[in-house]
Amino acid sequence: WTYPEDSAYALKDPFRRAAEILHYYSDLLGPFPYGSLAHVESSTRFGGMENSTAIFYDEKRYRQQNLGEPVVAHETAHQWFGDAVTERDWHHLWLSEGFATYLAALWQAHADGDSAFRAGMRQMADQVFESKEVGQPILDTTATDLVGLLNSNNYQKGAWVLHQLRGVVGDSAFFSGLRRYYSTFRDSTALSADFARIMSEAAGRDLDWYFRQALTQPGYPMLDLKWAHKGKKLTVDISQTQPAEWGEFQIPSLILLVDDIPVRLHVDGRQTRQVVEGIRRKPKRIEVDPNGWWLLKATVGSDR
């Protein structure tokens, strides 16, 4: 539903694939929870407002022609998470906003390819790195300004919490868990602990360690890697250099690309040393997390 003067723009750009987005989420998450969905141009003060069955979009964005499909994908995802499944407490807002942000990124991967998805995730990482909330945890129970919770922690970092979780448990368990979470709490409310429990069940292992660090610790891992090569052994020393008040992070499966050889490391604690056998030549290049599964910053030192 648009004002007559804005209909041409709406049909050619932001809403061109609106029906495809709806079908994609239905296949991915479970049945659309309502009988219909309308996209409505309105005078809302928000860029998009995810009212159940009737999403409102700011009329000014039509006039400026900067609404964009990512906003439509984000607000449509809220029909599942935010509307049908709602966080029980405002401090768990990431259960709405982080989910919608990541689902919009998944739509981008589906529609536009993996390179577009990776670029979007890198952009979100930069937003987290540069945000003023970086020193606060996602579950900030001290927050009293509820509107202030509409920040990068609950949107972009929340999306990264889901992306990292997917990397930890694998696609099968991750998407199975998402569908189970939706079907279990549809037309109801949930807390982060509910989601953590269902994902642990889907993965078949305890994920409390992950949700504890992802949701209750501020910041992100900052890694300094130093390496030495001798014979056929590569020794890698990893230091976590983030501020002490952020705590230490566990990264159970950190991939290093040593030239063209993927090496899997386990990072746990402020200092980690691992010796990798079978590296015959002195590396020319070492890349940390080449597939972009972790929200982190890393530096790699030269051979000692």
Regions found by a protein language model. Name each.
Residues L207-D208, P221-L223, W227-P290:
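Beta-strand-rich binding/interaction modules
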Residues P283, D303-R304:
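Short, gly/Ser/Thr-rich active-site loops of penicillin-recognizing serine hydrolases
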Residues W1-A244:
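Hydrophobic alpha-helical and helix-loop surface patches within well-folded domains
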Residues V263, P290-D303:
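Short acidic/polar inter-strand loop motif in beta-rich domains
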